[in-house]
Amino acid sequence: MRIIAKKDLFINDEIRVREVRLVGLDGEQMGIKPLSEAQAIADDANVDLVLIQPQATPPVAKIMNYGKFKFEYQKKRKEQRKKQSVVTVKEVRLSPVIDKGDFETKLRNGRKFLEKGNKVKVSIRFKGRMITHKEIGAKVLAEFAEKTQDIAIIEQRAKMDGRQMFMQLAPIPDKK
């Protein structure tokens, strides 16, 4: 069902057409009726007449409880927003000449981020003449990837960008 924004809907007295293709409360087609008759049917049922497709010829109007429709729509939207998960990218910065203890600390932080469901960008910044030894940086990134392979997949392989080498890891999606 296509949901229409409020500014696209015309309700009861806002409808300015001569005749409409009328759809009843339970979705049955009631045929093409003059607007006054459609309005009377809606009033008898104590509900609203809503123009849901003004571009059609003749325009389509539905008899419904607009307040309930709006409430259900907002409830669905809220439910959809709850289901959305916001994935953020966290960054772990390393050095090509990182010490073992520092590496373990950065690795622990990266694992925490991955376990929380965040993506991790692992970057190495080359300073001075270190840029001539890119293979050392690649080795550090490979070791980081190897030690997180049980909880992460490599989303973007190691690549150079100026004086920086980086790769991106993503948590392994749950198999349901």
UniProtKB/Swiss-Prot annotation:
Location in the cell reads: Cytoplasm
Q: Give the domain of life.
A: Bacteria
Output the Gene Ontology cellular-component terms. Answer: cytosol; membrane
Gene3D superfamilies named in the record: Translation initiation factor 3 (IF-3), C-terminal domain, Translation initiation factor 3 (IF-3), N-terminal domain
User: PROSITE patterns in the record, alphabetically?
Assistant: IF3
What is an example of a Pfam family matching this protein?
Answer: IF3_C
Give the InterPro entries listed for this entry.
T_IF-3_C_sf, T_IF-3_N_sf, Translation_initiation_fac3_CS, Translation_initiation_fac_3, Translation_initiation_fac_3_C, Translation_initiation_fac_3_N
What is one process in the GO biological process aspect for this record? ribosome disassembly
Which GO-annotated molecular functions does the record name? Answer: ribosome binding; translation initiation factor activity
Give the record's keywords alphabetically. Cytoplasm, Initiation factor, Protein biosynthesis
**Which family is this protein grouped under?**
Belongs to the IF-3 family.
Q: What does this protein do?
A: IF-3 binds to the 30S ribosomal subunit and shifts the equilibrium between 70S ribosomes and their 50S and 30S subunits in favor of the free subunits, thus enhancing the availability of 30S subunits on which protein synthesis initiation begins.
What subunit structure does UniProt give? Monomer.
Protein name, please?
A: Translation initiation factor IF-3
